[in-house]
Amino acid sequence: MALILVLLALALWGGVALAQAPELSAKLAACETGADAKDRFAVFTGSMPREGAAVMAMRFDLHERLPGGRFKRVALANWGVWQSTAKKGVPGFIFTKRVEELAAPAAFRAVVSFRWSDVEGNVVRTAKRTSPICRQPDWRPDLRVGRVVFDEDGRARAIVVNDGRSPSGTFEISMDVRDRSVVRTLPGLPAGQRRTVELGRCSAPGSATVTADPAHAVEEADEGDNAVTVACPVKR
């Protein structure tokens, strides 16, 4: 479940008169991301022209899509409720909402419903618009074994890469050859960096499986690319 806080719901009308009628739209005004939840937020703006109505109203519903899923409505305080104005002399209604501490990885959008009513409270028109998507990428580290090479004596060297957006903590890298296992410990790997690790020897026939973080000490964006199996070299 996403940890989401509503920070601001600000109606913009009155005070400064609008020069012209705003368009009917739902916009993504801002989308910020970051490794910490406190850095992630989105701002959505809905606007509607008056078109002769006595009362203009709009409702924001936040929708979230998790990896591999579909967009689903998120129940939030102060969302999913109608905001309205009957202020005279303004050509339209603009309303802005901000949501903070967005989950990651995930995608968010606002579905904005519009309603026009006459002086007697009768709804004379309705409409709906969907904002562009605010995408929050996965900020976790992503370890993988990039390549395994062998020296002339059959000693393996593995290149370990962190393809993620944040540094990893301490983890192990192992090489399994038949009934033998060699394990090395790395103090961590910064995002976007790689490191060469010297492992044990192996020789044909047989194969070696090199695994980054075999103990799953690091929570990663993708756990499916941590191991590589290669043929052991023929002795010279």
Indicate where each model-derived feature is located:
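Bacterial N-terminal signal peptides
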Residues: 3-13
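Surface-exposed loop/edge segments in extracytoplasmic proteins
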Residues: 67-78, 179-185
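Short coil-to-beta strand junction motifs in C2/discoidin
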Residues: 54-60, 168-173
